[in-house]
Amino acid sequence: LVVAPLRPVTRADQLPLYVVLHGRGSNPAAMERLTSLAAVTGPAVLVYPAGYEDSWNAGGCCGYAHADGINDVAFIHAVVQGVLAEYPAVDPQRAFAFGFSNGGRMTYRLACDLPGTFAGIAAVEAVPVVDCRRLHPLDVEIIAQRRDPLLAIASGAPRKSMDGYVEPTVQSAVDQWRRLDGCAPPATTSHRGTATLRTWRCRAGTRLQYTLYSGGGHLWPHAHGTRPAADGIILPFVRSAPRPAD
């Protein structure tokens, strides 16, 4: 599923590319409905790929794609290259990957295994299940909700498991990516309604932002009352992201 600008565009437009990955058991059309990205991105090309048997092989565990050894890293790389060939107006230095749940896990893997492809990622309600030892600098947004029944939030919280895989806590995932991205303390803390945002400055001018919502569940946060939409957190964050270092 590709959503492109309706008006004619040229190479001079230098549009961003957003690759948006659905969760396990979902699909591209459902992911488009789940988010409001297409309505709020402005001029951009959005791509909603379809995972194998509605899942992604993010490494570590879970789903048909993992069980059958599907090479989703190569698949997403081919998707990006195909879009760049078909839409010359897309700026290859402004490609980003967003994902929810299993799709969020996959964005972590893409950051590790496709260095230089994406300028930034956003993982919503997801922790990494891949052992990433080295990372080319890129912007990273991690979004979680305190009452997510499938994720443990604080470092000392009882860890959750899925399909026999014991997952890291969200805080330990944040700490891991702070190390990988070379982020320096202290964090800058800000608040947007029910969300607390902590932002670190990292290597090569990149940033890591951890957004934690009070309440919530295992879902893509939508705007309601004082709760900001996840889309409104992610897009301002990634728009100024530099391309990963070579």
Q: Model regions: which residues?
A:
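Serine-hydrolase catalytic machinery in alpha/beta-hydrolase-like enzymes
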Residues: 1-7, 13-96, 105-109, 113, ...
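C-terminal catalytic histidine-bearing segment of alpha/beta-hydrolase fold enzymes
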Residues: 139-143, 168, 178-246
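Short alpha-helix in the alpha/beta-hydrolase fold that links the catalytic acid
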Residues: 33-34, 152-179, 189-199
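Active-site nucleophile loop of the alpha/beta-hydrolase fold
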Residues: 51, 122-129, 145-149
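Acidic glycine-/aspartate-rich tracts in secreted/extracellular proteins
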Residues: 8-9, 24-26, 51-54, 147-149, ...
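Conserved strand-to-loop "acid loop" that flanks and positions the catalytic carboxylate
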Residues: 143-148, 154-155, 161-162, 212-216
